[in-house]
Amino acid sequence: MTQTSFSDPAVMAELLAKMLWEIKAVHFNAAEPYKLASGMRSPVYIDCRKLLSYPRVRSAVMDFAVATLLRNAGFEQFDCIAGGETAGIPFAALLADRLALPMIYVRKQPKGHGRNAQIEGHMPDGARVLVIEDLTTAGGSMFTFIDAVRAAGGVVDHGIALFFYGIFPQAHQRFENGNVKLHYIATWRNVLAVARDQKLFDDKTLSEVESFLDAPLEWSGRNGGVSTLG
């Protein structure tokens, strides 16, 4: 059932950040930085897939996603929800159920046998499709799915990520250039604010994380990762 109450966006962002800490989805390792799909190296990592294992948490997060979409996109803007392989698929199912909409999922590439399909499920030509991912860094993976939906005849004007890194100016430009409005609930700044408030990181760790968030590509380049985004 679609919820129609609208929490303050700042409250939802703070609550999601607290949830991610509570379920131990936030990880830090500056000595051996995490490698992201973009090729970047990062001292911090968020595992949003863990949200699925906590029913009360995931229900609240879906409430937040619905409120964000209804507030910022509208009530009758979508014909279908598309989940990106693989982490976006379960969240697409949950969101589609909340919004009483059909669901499809999109592979990163055609499967190479059978119908050689990249999109699974029924999507009418011209359907207005919302693409969902658990998180997005700079938008590259989301546009893999957006481009596939558009190539198959769908219309994509909106995407949603439960968590958005929010530290790359290039990301905002990518979505603007791609004519897609990105919706999201929380960013790294929200997670860091909770860490500071609840003293979840010591001062040295906070400083290292802030150094990354303030200049992520420079930090990545110094630590064995890419220093530019494609």
Curated annotation (Swiss-Prot):
Single annotated GO MF: orotate phosphoribosyltransferase activity
InterPro entries: OPRT (IPR023031), Or_phspho_trans_dom (IPR004467), PRibTrfase_dom (IPR000836), PRTase-like (IPR029057)
Disulfide bonds: none
GO BP field: 'de novo' UMP biosynthetic process; pyrimidine nucleobase biosynthetic process
Pathway note: Pyrimidine metabolism; UMP biosynthesis via de novo pathway; UMP from orotate: step 1/2
Residues where orotate binds: 137
Enzyme class (EC, first level): transferase
Enzyme Commission number(s): 2.4.2.10
Subunit structure, as described in the record: Homodimer.
Entry function: Catalyzes the transfer of a ribosyl phosphate group from 5-phosphoribose 1-diphosphate to orotate, leading to the formation of orotidine monophosphate (OMP).
Family listed: Belongs to the purine/pyrimidine phosphoribosyltransferase family. PyrE subfamily.
Name under which the protein is recorded: Orotate phosphoribosyltransferase
Organism name: Allorhizobium ampelinum (strain ATCC BAA-846 / DSM 112012 / S4) (Agrobacterium vitis (strain S4))
